[in-house]
Amino acid sequence: MFGGIAIILYPQAASWFSQREQSRAIEAAQARLDEPPNNSSDARRAQLALAHAYNDALASGAIFEANANIATGGGSGADSPFVYEEILDLAGGGFMGRLRYDSLGIDLPIYHGTSDETLERGVGHLEGTSLPVGGVGTRSVLTAHRGLPEATLFDNLNQSEVGDSFTVAVLDQVLAYEVIDVQVVEPDQTQAILAVEDRDLVTLVTCTPLGINSHRILVTAERVTPTPVEDAEAATAVPDIPKFPWWSVILAVSFIALATFVWRSGIVRTDGAGEATPEPSESDEITDH
């Protein structure tokens, strides 16, 4: 019984530990950013300026591979000295920023690229699309897994609705976005993620249906300015997920119930074993006549 309950609760427990690690990653990255020389305003402004310059030089485009869990970049930068992996990487480890989508319970670190290793840790920025620093004529594409048994990432992205809001925090800036479009597309419909002139966009991407991954959910949002104060405060606050692990309470209660059952069963067996079997008397013996 206990083993069955443990199996049922495994996805919840694994997701809880994964969320805890993601929150710790955000806190650790923020701590590194608060240390010299990363806490220098000049250093941060220089990185943001470099990111904007990269976006200006970018020939935007991307390719989604059919039947794959991740998106792969097909865009390329114009001839330039930019090193993608080094831009916005003041915190180290490829950490780029933080995505917070409160209504879906998403609070995840954003990393460079979309390798398997990256997407096991959080959200990946699709190389070949704009870096998530905002700007007219840009579209940043952020992608994450959906349906992993050991982690909850973009699992709830299919519940996105027009009018939802989320934030992207990168270095000193917090950008707020409002969802304007939710659609499901074929992997080769790359025009759906191209930058649009005079618009500041972010598109969140994940695979669908679960376990098949033949299509992509695209959640596109447009920048809201200025960033609401409450959104800015939440985006820079200590992560508040995972929530209390109720699964651990269920597991503990189940274990106690099982232990109590085994203990009481042992008492009954012991009591029964202590009763002596009466010896047959002579009068009870069967004789032949």
What are these regions (language model features)?
Residues M1-K243, D271-G274, P278:
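Solvent-exposed, non-transmembrane regions of membrane-associated and secreted proteins
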Residues A234-H289:
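C-terminal single-pass membrane-anchor helix
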